[in-house]
Amino acid sequence: VVDIVAARPIDLAIVEGIESMAGGEGPWIPRVRPNRPGLLVAGTNCVTTDAVATALMGFDPMADRGAAPFETCDSTLRLAEDAGLGTRDLKRIEVLGVPLEKARYPFRG
């Protein structure tokens, strides 16, 4: 993903969080449950937009390998930040609309 964004920067990033699922990768997983946070996140930088969406899901966008949601993989947010594509530091991201504290919706399995 980082290589693709580096090769062709994204002009508008949208994360659709109107309806989703948690607890697994699909409906075939017995513990999967529906989530209906009713949120849309949009921005002109895909790294910052994804960092905000990650935080809205109850995860720390500054987390790295070994911490949720990156328990078994490298953080694509860190890789993108290291490549100079944007920041994952919420203190450096301007958020408009509903404050993060009010919009958070826990997605933990």
Residues of each region from the PLM?
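Acidic/aromatic/glycine-rich contiguous surface patches that form carbohydrate-binding/processing clefts
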Residues: 1-109
